[in-house]
Amino acid sequence: MNAAIPNQAAKFLAATAHVDEAAVQPLPNSRKIYVEGSTPDIRVPMREIRQADTPLMFSGEAGTGAERSEPNPPIFVYDCSGPYTDPAAKIDIREGLPALRTKWIEARGDTEVLRDLSSEYGRQQAANPELATMRFPGLHRHPRRAKAGMNVTQMHYARQGIITPEMEFIAIRENNNRAAYLESLRASGPQGAKLAALMSRQHPGQNFGANLQGEITPEFVRDEVARGRAIIPNNINHPESEPMIIGRNFLVKINANIGNSALGSSIQEEVEKMTWAIRWGGDTVMDLSTGKNIHETREWIIRNSPVPIGTVPIYQALEKVDGKAEELTWEMFRDTLVEQAEQGVDYFTIHAGVLLRYVPMTANRMTGIVSRGGSIMAKWCLAHHKESFLYTHFEEICEIMKAYDVAFSLGDGLRPGSIYDANDEAQLSELRTLGELTQVAWKHDVQVMIEGPGHVPMQLIKENMDIQLESCSEAPFYTLGPLTTDIAPGYDHITSGIGAAMIGWYGTAMLCYVTPKEHLGLPDKDDVKEGIITYKLAAHAADLAKGHPGAQIRDNALSKARFEFRWDDQFNLGLDPDKAKSFHDETLPKESAKVAHFCSMCGPHFCSMKITQDVREFAAKEGLNEADALARGMEVKAVEFVKQGAEVYRKV
């Protein structure tokens, strides 16, 4: 097998590669902060959003003087953007990000640095002079692998009772600095205790058996990983990544898919999609490239990514045999796994549950097999009339995974591609097989999550979640949507966002975004952002519905800002400050409108919140509570009505 010689090298030159300037700007009125752990090298990033003070007229405090106001301390939100939004960081994508986990990995003493790449294909690519102009220039280290007989997975450490720095990092990150925020409220003034109670109020949730914690501790993280209910996707060859966790007892996460195709995109564009995706909240990114220079594209993405990177290795393996599925071999696939593991891929989607006997079950479907990986393996099974090498060599795959700490994302190759096919025999048979394979992986202390559908109408979503929890022993579920209807091409980020919010509530740990281009074309940067924002909404709505501790703080802060006409704070506390501000400024562009007590929806005389504030002012002036003030106000208006002739309509 010869390494591919690119025919598009001139389109991307490593020497002129540059960061997307839009991705490195701090979000409005926000700054990057770092919360330190038990050692100085555990520095957990968060985004601090500063707010304006509440004017006296809204604060509820007695007293006079324009200087009196109620402070609104900054709130803290989960931040996936890595150093890109930190003005103090020096970003050069030709050098990649700092390897922040290297010392932790070295300190464990169970890995070794290899003299050369283990993959035949990787060595061919490294030696190919035609690739010199596009090759990532900043990697000055050799890959690592577990020492002989060692297991380097976070699950293995967890089962040995070891709390790793990654686990402590995650515990701090999941708590979102909530304790510090509430303390800042209590210390903010005479109304501090009342304000803390107001901002921390949250509706009780329905968590469907999830084990949510008031405070996440490193020990809780360790226990969940040991049980297999959560995974930490952190390949030892991706030390640039910031530790994160995927599990239903933690915040719901989202994934963004990027990747080139045979019809378009370049390395520069894919790196820009990655940095754009994490800016808006992508917790992980999957590189699904199927076009030219897959190896080189992936290297650039991994070296510049602070979030875990996932792939579907069978895509690249298929490119190596010119798209002929029947020519795939275990040896070629194994080499691809090692190649990608030594680059630093954090999780592999592997469609090992597509069994030969399940393929005929799809014959009467409306849309057949829609998974690319699933269709590749189904074709291979039929061509050779035997079970796929992914299934028969699964234990050997586990040996590779635990040597680099790559997590499984067991692929749903028979997922439904239409609501007509939802929850059918093929889909659920494969799901149960994935549960069996999970037990095999856990025997090797290899981390596992399970991929899910797909297209499922709302009334069938909970059944899907319940079957997964039972069949897969609560291994994290990772779903594409699901799309709840098939009638809206161009709007499938919405059709799927509905299903994503529901299945996230029922227990899915990570939601794979869908962009408006789904089923229609390759998404660009704008589509990536649209998909991310939609899925951040779905994940947050799921956290609220589950009753995840502290989930409502941001909602409360934005609602308070809205009621107090703090327009800039409304924009900045939202998921997309830029769009919120642009919509407002379309009709009220002047700076004075940022302090106006109305917007263009109702105008100055019909703003419900302004009317409510008028009632409160009237109540305070008359010494009444709000209910009595409304009654007194109605009496006054009634007298006016009679004096004016008791006519429903008056000439003016």
Swiss-Prot record:
Ligand binding ([4Fe-4S] cluster): 599, 602, 607
Pathway: Cofactor biosynthesis; thiamine diphosphate biosynthesis
Reaction equations catalysed: 5-amino-1-(5-phospho-beta-D-ribosyl)imidazole + S-adenosyl-L-methionine = 4-amino-2-methyl-5-(phosphooxymethyl)pyrimidine + CO + 5'-deoxyadenosine + formate + L-methionine + 3 H(+)
Gene3D superfamilies documented for this protein: 6.10.250.620, Radical SAM ThiC family, central domain
Domain of life: Bacteria
A Gene Ontology biological process term: thiamine diphosphate biosynthetic process
GO molecular function annotations of the record: 4 iron, 4 sulfur cluster binding; carbon-carbon lyase activity; zinc ion binding
Protein name listed in UniProt: Phosphomethylpyrimidine synthase
Organism: Thiobacillus denitrificans (strain ATCC 25259 / T1)
Name of the encoding gene: thiC
